[in-house]
Curated annotation (Swiss-Prot):
Residues annotated as binding 5-methyltetrahydropteroyltri-L-glutamate: R17, E18, W19, K20, K111, R519, C520, W565, E609
Name under which the protein is recorded: 5-methyltetrahydropteroyltriglutamate--homocysteine methyltransferase
Enzyme active site: H698 (proton donor)
Organism: Bacillus cereus (strain B4264)
One Gene Ontology term of the molecular function aspect: zinc ion binding
Length: 762
């Protein structure tokens, strides 16, 4: 039996975020297309070279992208919306789809399964001619072969997952469009096989959550493809969960090998193998290293997994690989020497995970004695972090034990609270507000950098933050917004900011991962018990409120979002970590309220993305996620208005959960998803305060008043005007001042027009 190492995908952004910087330089016309393509090629080949040097045998090719791999697939197959037909060059079309243009909105963006990565949603239009417009995987395969001598493994998004992620068709049209994908996929795979690709990885993550009927549909497509490409080595790759429910059928697919996730789907996949075995004529690709977290593997546990598999599986070949693409992890931990030894030793970023794969390969091919020293080191590291004081705080344990049922609910029901809040806040019909952040200009970022580097004093930095806050309070007053925000100029990131001020968190210097496009985030590391230390937002919020007679919102990030946007310790359940964060935020909210802040927003944009892929597992997650929010927010007075915010989610799955949060007002991304949530509300009622975002903040274009008014009009068909708010989709941190001010002016004017119409109709 042959055993090989493989990787499913490598982080794109570069060790020093060279990828991000190159993209943004190109977008701002600081480099031309030739320089852009040259630099991107250098980065792409460097990533292949690193994996080669680490000893990976099946190196992924084609996982690299200029923006998003789903967008790459859409372009490759001709899924190009007609509104972009005026563009002729590849890059102009590609980036217009991703980012929009002066005259046209971008394609929708949403979360990649239950991760914090965002993909561009493919759009199907009537009359679309589906064909292989560009065999990009072939070009990149040949490039790696010619430039580096690497006979790589092309990676493509599978036809079933691709079409399931697309929009614009009816369910009745789905089977027909799916069949139309056969020809371009046959051409793609045939050309790769002819070029000599030793194996082709076909990603089908959606297989973890298909119905029996859908699996049969998918099988028919693979049979049609295999009939035309009989000799290509196709590796069907699943990840993010088990395929237990459909395993018996999936192992009969006409493919050469099947990749299973034994981290996030370990129990289900092992159960399925135990029950149905594994085909002797197929390769089993074992996802045994966590591709979504940053902790060293438990090598003993991984080797035990292989012992179990080898007793049950008589396959011809085994592949040792991560559970999913390493896109979701930072690149290398070697620069994180500022961390404590116990934490640094416990980490494994992408490059360290590749080394772990090679260690496991050595143990499997040469015996565990060949890595005996490494095994001993790993055992010591795990023991040290498990027994650390940071993970065993008695005060945190006591606070958790003391929780009572009444800690999870507000004293009065929403309707009665809202009446009291209307009296206390004196807001107009259809109040306007923003989501929280204002532009982080070059000056803001530079001043923060100077402060962090000791170039300016704490006092100078605080004066600068106050100056920016006052400037934007005045802007908001002039624009005519009803509920103001302080602008969050002191915050780099909505999760990092709180993590820096809570016990149990640590921070990397270079632990960046891609969120969407060129936007990278540096998730905090929750390594210990989380606890409140001191006030985190009081000073800035109270200062902003002192500048105006209007209401200023306090702005916090919610417990579930902090959890889902962090790298989380894996020694206790996520629910327990979430409750720890909620208790710390509860303390902060009480301080804001006692300081005179009457509206407090607790953002939960990541609530939906944390949901398990399988519907049977949703209830358990939603229960503790909602309870975490309630634990954080339920101790305030009835007159204090609790807001929350969500974005980029499939909200129809969680309308009941949104209702259960019992927030007085929720603001939701609407315009980027082209009104999808408005459609959801046509089939259900939402009887609490709600603001449906009226413009997409991720595009540089300034929408007209009429565009926003149209969304308000559509929203009021499904929402009670008494409870309706008007706001942008998300925070405005990444936009420029000259984009934000006219957009908000248009938004306020749209609100005034809507109020006038309501009064006239009344």
């Amino acid at each position: 039996m042959a055993i090989q190492t493989s990787n499913l995908g490598y982080p794109r952004i570069g060790l020093q975020r060279e990828w991000k910087k190159t993209l943004e330089a190109f977008w701002s016309n600081k480099i031309d297309e030739e320089q852009f393509l040259t630099t991107m090629k250098e980065i792409r080949l460097q990533h292949v070279k690193v994996q080669q040097e680490k000893g990976i045998e099946l190196i992924p090719i084609g996982d690299f992208t200029y923006y998003d791999h789903v967008l790459d697939t859409a372009y490759m197959l001709g899924f190009i919306p007609s509104r972009f037909s005026e563009f002729t060059s590849y890059l102009d079309v590609y980036f217009a789809m991703a980012r929009g243009s002066k005259d046209h909105v971008a394609s929708e963006m949403t979360k990649w399964f239950n991760t914090n990565y965002h993909y561009i949603v493919p759009e199907y239009e009537e009359g679309l001619q589906i064909s292989l417009k560009d065999n990009r995987p072939l070009r990149l395969y040949e490039e790696a072969k010619q430039e580096l001598g690497v006979d790589g493994k092309p990676v493509i998004l599978g036809p079933y997952t691709f079409l399931k992620l697309a929009k614009g068709y009816t369910q009745e049209q789905f089977p027909t469009i799916l069949k139309q994908l056969v020809a371009p996929y046959v051409q793609l795979l045939s050309e790769l096989h002819t070029a000599g690709a030793p194996a082709i990885q076909v990603d089908e993550p959606i297989f973890a959550s298909l119905t029996k009927k859908e699996v049969q549909q998918a099988k028919e497509i693979y049979e049609a493809i295999r009939k035309e490409v009989p000799n290509a080595t196709l590796l069907l790759q699943t990840y993010f969960d088990s395929v237990e429910e459909n395993y018996e059928e999936i192992i009969t697919f006409p493919v050469s090998g099947i990749g299973l996730d034994f981290i996030h789907g370990k129990e289900g996949n092992l159960n399925a193998i135990s029950k149905y075995g594994f085909p002797a004529d197929k390769t089993l690709a074992v996802g045994c290293i966590d591709g979504r977290n940053i902790w060293r593997a438990d090598l003993d546990e991984v080797l035990e997994l292989f012992t179990t598999l080898q007793k049950q599986v008589q396959t011809k070949d085994i592949i040792v690989q991560p559970s999913c693409s390493l896109l979701h992890t930072p690149i290398d931990k070697t620069e994180e020497t500022h961390l404590s030894t116990e934490l640094f030793d416990a980490l494994a970023f992408a490059n360290q995970k590749l080394e772990e794969l090679v260690l496991i390969h050595s143990a499997l091919t040469q015996g565990t004695e060949s890595i005996s020293n490494e095994l001993e080191t790993y055992r010591n590291v795990h023991h040290t972090i498990r027994s650390s004081a940071a993970r065993n705080r008695e005060d945190v344990k006591a606070a958790r034990t003391a929780l009572k049922e009444e800690d999870f609910s507000r004293p009065l029901p929403f309707e009665k609270r809202y009446e009291l809040q209307q009296v206390a806040l004196e807001l107009p019909l259809l109040p306007t507000t923003t989501i929280g952040s204002f532009p982080q200009t070059t000056e803001v970022r530079q001043t923060r950098k100077e402060w962090r580097n000791g170039v300016i004093s704490n006092e100078q930095y605080e004066q600068f933050i106050e100056k920016e806050t006052e400037k934007w309070i005045r802007y908001q007053e002039e624009i005519g917004l009803d509920v103001l925000v302080h602008g969050e100029f002191e915050r780099t990131d909505m999760v990092e900011y709180f993590g820096e001020r809570l016990a149990g968190f640590s921070f990397t210097k270079n632990g960046w991962v891609q969120s969407y496009g060129s936007r990278c985030v540096k998730p905090p590391v929750i390594y210990g018990d989380v606890a409140f230390i001191n006030g985190m937002t009081i000073k800035e919020t109270v200062y902003a409120q002192s500048l105006t007679e209007k209401v200023v919102k306090g702005m916090l990030t919610g417990p579930v979002t902090i959890l889902n946007w962090s790298f989380v310790r894996n020694d206790i359940p996520r629910k327990e970590v979430s409750y720890q964060i909620a208790l710390a935020l509860r303390h902060e909210i009480e301080l804001l309220e006692s300081s005179g802040i009457r509206v407090i927003q607790v953002d939960e944009p990541a609530l939906r993305e944390g949901m398990p892929l399988k519907e049977k597992d949703w209830d358990a997650y939603i229960t503790w996620a909602v309870q975490s929010f309630l634990l954080a927010t339920s101790s305030v007075a009835n007159e204090t208005q609790i807001h929350t915010h969500m974005c980029y989610s499939n909200f129809e799955d969680i309308v009941d959960a949104i209702r259960a949060l019992d927030a007085d007002v929720i603001s939701i991304e609407t315009s980027r998803s082209h009104g999808e949530f408005i459609d959801t509300l046509k089939h259900t009622t939402y009887e609490k305060g709600i603001g449906l975002g009226v413009y997409d903040i991720h595009s540089p274009r300034v929408p007209s008043k009429d565009e926003m008014y149209t969304i308000v009009e559509q929203s009021l068909e499904v929402c009670d005007p008494k409870y309706f708010w008007i706001n942008p989709d998300c925070g405005l941190k990444t936009r420029r001042t000259e984009e934000v001010i006219p957009a908000l002016e248009h938004m306020v004017q749209a609100a005034k027009d809507a109020r006038s119409l309501l009064k006239t109709n009344a």
